[in-house]
Amino acid sequence: VLQFKEEFYRHFNIQKDEYFFSKINSLSSFPKGCFGTLKLHNSNLSYFDVGGNFALELEKEGEKASIDFVLNTLRSSFGNTIDKYLIKAHATLWGKNKFFGGSYSSAQPGKAHLRNSLKSSVAEKIFFAGEAISSNYATVHGADLSGKDTAIKVIKVLKL
C-alpha cells in the first residue's frame, strides 16, 4: 500500500478506484509485473498486488524490495516526480506466514465451483471459513461474511 499526497492524484488526473496494470516488457522464468487500484475508495491510498513465484521472490528480498518494485513500475508510467508525492509505503509478507503461505486466494481455471465444497463441514465437527470459500473471494469482507455464516452453522450444531 502506498500513501500519496492528494496532489499526486490531482496532478495526474487520477480518479477514485482507477485500475493500474504494468506492462511486462521481458520474458523470464515467470512474469514480473503488478496491478493495483489507485486512489482506493477515494482515499489517498493506492493498493498493489504481485503474485506467483515473483511475489515469493520479492518477499525473500524483504519489504523494501516489494515497495521499490512497485515504485519503479509507477515511475515508468508517471516519471520520477512521483517521489515528491509519496508519504509512506508498506508491504505485507504473507507468504512467510506459516498459517497463510500467501495472501490472495485464487482458483485454477475451471475449478472455482469447488469453493462451495469447502463450505461443508466434516461430520459437523470441523468447519471452514474465510475469503477463499466466499463468493466474495479475495476480499476482507468476503472473509468476514464467511466467518459469520460459519459461526451461525456452528451455533446451530451446538444448539446454543
Regions found by a protein language model. Give the residues of each.
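Conserved flavin/dinucleotide-binding core of flavoenzymes
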Residues: 11-160
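Central beta-strand plus flanking loop segment that forms part of the substrate or channel wall
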Residues: 1-13
